[in-house]
């Protein structure tokens, strides 16, 4: 739905009034075309400020439905306006109100692949298994549209993958297999769905994939299902047309559940002009040749009986909002008018959604974008035309011969080209193997139940897996398959044949090398990611170590300062002790003092006055102060080893000793 979303060019629209094209010659005043925005219109075109103003006023019913039965939340969910959906959900709107067809906002978001919106809705209590009037759940809608990531998201959210719709008895796996969505089928198989469930007609998902020509899905499902006896597939009573030995291999037209046909958001300006005829004075404008503006592509039928009554004429198929859609789709439609007008059953690729499933295509299903169904879906209408014509000539040959050269669509004014005479090709696998000299390998293919139709879909790796290991026969088979798919005549000379075979071999070798390079690139990305994680871990460890080192350095500096202070106090204590001892000796032994030489004066390092000038009480007090300072420093250096009471007791002991010495 991304190609139809107006998110890409929304700023260009905000400066323009809401008006519509009424055709050439319609005289409409500007005042008649200026329409005020209501809540539903603002939610549909992404006018966040208008919706915010309506919510803040609290005068409007945010769950009110318009004439079509849609609420503002439905429009925002369908088109993909995440911010508006979030705003409405915060305002408390109901998330399970259905449309007249029974479709909830979750179903509308799923049908368009809006994963973020689906996530918001589920967070607000949206019912995952709610069904519409057809019995389809949200998983059915995104499966039918081919939105791979939405299917994966719903499966991870707990959606029931084995639910069945009541009309045909289809399961989501059957819908994906019949539509040709390989990756979605792979998701279902990995999720563990039941592969042997049958619909009301008795067909399984594998049979439906085979019926509509999706052989890759058939091979994919065979690897996830038990091997059944050949008699079950060869029975003449049931599913005889599904036998792999049917060489004509017509691709039947898939009948889809019919939807109520009415005005859609994609109907274009003509439908809007019809329902707003009152703006022209209530009169229908006269019929004249009208040319739509740039961005609206119309299909004109050159055949009177082609698509008559299907409502395909003058129908816009591109969004005029996206300029890239205008340039691509309009030019392609002008170049291929014949194909668009005479669209029949279309040969569908098993990895994409194609143009349409049948003639009775609806306006919603025929133009719905499928950006995540396949990254290779951006091919133009011209390429799809060639594919359609080639496969039509290949598979609708009534005589079973090989196709002639690919037909070319006749454009207006061009002369018909002379058709080349067709040549007769092999009608079965034995004839083909005999022509290329590999008839001895027929038994190998018969053991694997491979006929001509399946043989033409094999690759070099498939042949090697079957048992064709010799290089020569394997190269002959791949070259024959390549020539058949290109609808080319066998070369008339050996040199041309060798050149064609060499080109085919080089292409296959390049494909193998590309696959290997992609795997190596993915492995290198993983290694780079691991190295980035390791680097982040190492950097965090280094930062922690650096922080720890800085803390230890600061502690060492603090300890060094304390040690220096303690050394100074210790020197002072020694000087004080020496002076005190000298005086005590003089006081107790005066006679000895006269006989012996006097003591040398103590070194008074750091003392403000000489120690000799202090009296004994003063000297004792100074000694007590220095002991107290020493205790404080030791406690700061080694906290917790000596309690305060012990230090006080130690200081008291020293003081008493000094007093006794003085006495």
Curated annotation (Swiss-Prot):
Modified residues (Phosphothreonine): 318
ANK repeats: 34-64, 68-97, 101-130, 134-163, 168-197, 201-220
Family annotation (InterPro entries): ANKS3_SAM, Ankyrin_rpt, Ankyrin_rpt-contain_sf, SAM, SAM/pointed_sf
Coiled coil feature spans: 500-575
Ranges where the record places region Interaction with NEK7: 1-421
Pfam families hit by this protein: Ank_2 (PF12796), Ank_4 (PF13637), SAM_1 (PF00536)
An annotated GO cellular component: cytoplasm
Protein name: Ankyrin repeat and SAM domain-containing protein 3
Chain's gene name: Anks3
